[in-house]
Swiss-Prot record:
The chain crosses the membrane at residues 8-28. This is Cytochrome c-type biogenesis protein CcmE. The gene is ccmE. GO terms for biological process: cytochrome complex assembly. GO terms for cellular component: plasma membrane. It is a single-pass type II membrane protein. It comes from Polynucleobacter necessarius subsp. necessarius (strain STIR1). Heme binds at H121, Y125. Keywords: Cell inner membrane, Cell membrane, Cytochrome c-type biogenesis, Heme, Iron, Membrane, Metal-binding, Signal-anchor, Transmembrane, Transmembrane helix. Residues 29-144 are periplasmic. GO terms for molecular function: heme binding; metal ion binding. Pfam families: CcmE (PF03100). Residues 1-7 are cytoplasmic.
């Protein structure tokens, strides 16, 4: 085989390898993306179907119920409520009436099955998306 043909085969093989690597990276990134939605968007059917996503809002007062390691509570944006089930130990800062972001999937019964629970870590901090969603929900709730 001539050196020119060898070089061409090496270049073609390298391009194919780079293409396969790029596809694998994009696939991995796509499967790790968790979209952020509000309880109102979930109730309106705007949540992603069949994939994990995040819900942000406030933990509704009086909704926290523990059954062994399973915890049931309600996340709200002050306009709509979504029931949540989580198996595991909650973060220390997780409390009723405080902000939280929950990652997981909806089940067929309309309950959000959480795989991860993040609690608001500072008295004054709230993610911009959650603050905007709560402000919108308050405006919509007071307009009715």
């Amino acid at each position: 085989m001539k050196p020119r043909h060898k070089r061409a085969l090496i270049i073609i093989a390298a391009l194919i390898a780079i293409g396969v690597a790029a596809l694998l990276i994009l696939n991995a990134l796509n499967s790790n993306i968790a979209l952020y939605v509000t309880p109102s968007e979930v109730a309106a059917g705007k949540a992603p179907q069949g994939q994990a996503f995040r819900i942000g809002g406030m933990v509704k007062d009086g909704s926290l119920k523990r059954d062994g390691l399973t915890v049931h509570f309600v996340i709200t944006d002050l306009a709509k409520d979504i029931p949540v089930a989580y198996i595991g130990i909650l973060p220390d800062l997780f409390k009723e009436g405080k902000g939280a972001v929950i990652q997981g999937r909806m089940n067929a019964n309309g309950e959000f099955i959480a795989s991860e629970v993040l609690a608001k870590h500072d008295e004054n901090y709230m993610p911009p998306e959650a603050k905007h969603a709560l402000d919108q929900a308050q405006k919509n709730g007071s307009a009715k």
